[in-house]
Amino acid sequence: MMGGEAPELSAQERAGKAFPVSWDQFHRDCRALTWRLNEVGPFHAVIAITRGGLVPAAIVARELGVRVIDTVCIASYDHNKQGELQVLKGISEAAMKLGGGTGKGLLIVDDLVDTGKTGKLVREMLPDAHFATVYAKPKGRPLVDTYITEVSQDTWIFFPWDTALSYHPPLRDGAA
């Protein structure tokens, strides 16, 4: 830090509120999402936005009986700092053909829509696809067709694949 500049805060530090999600809760939420999607389908393929969309896409595809799964790899976070969007891997030609080039009959799945930047980019690639997320924040929610839980914009979701169980000493031993 030079010349009295404030340190750059991570997205997590700016968010302030924590929303930890266990594996059990995440699986229940994905199944609830599937119940809603079952009324919308059928779908020819599931497109997972990686990496966060991989786990929910696997659960949703299994529950809906969809065998074709593809990914679109977009990097926007470096650990916990959001940066410029970078398409690392586009949607396969085979999946694009299944969706008629516009995404019709395709299901895009992600864990969360936050600011909507990633969602907007994928929507441009597949404008007629159905976009589903497990969680949604207000800024990104308008881009999503189906979601399960809305959280405030200032909430940081701790997904089970990003966390680990750890020992905490009892309060009487000075734990906060």
Swiss-Prot record:
Keywords: Cell inner membrane, Cell membrane, Glycosyltransferase, Magnesium, Membrane, Metal-binding, Purine salvage, Transferase. It is a peripheral membrane protein. InterPro entries: PRibTrfase_dom, PRTase-like, Xanthine_Guanine_PRibTrfase. It comes from the Bacteria. Belongs to the purine/pyrimidine phosphoribosyltransferase family. XGPT subfamily. Purine salvage pathway enzyme that catalyzes the transfer of the ribosyl-5-phosphate group from 5-phospho-alpha-D-ribose 1-diphosphate (PRPP) to the N9 position of the 6-oxopurines guanine and xanthine to form the corresponding ribonucleotides GMP (guanosine 5'-monophosphate) and XMP (xanthosine 5'-monophosphate), with the release of PPi. To a lesser extent, also acts on hypoxanthine. Homotetramer. HAMAP family: XGPRT. This is Xanthine-guanine phosphoribosyltransferase. It comes from Bradyrhizobium diazoefficiens (strain JCM 10833 / BCRC 13528 / IAM 13628 / NBRC 14792 / USDA 110).
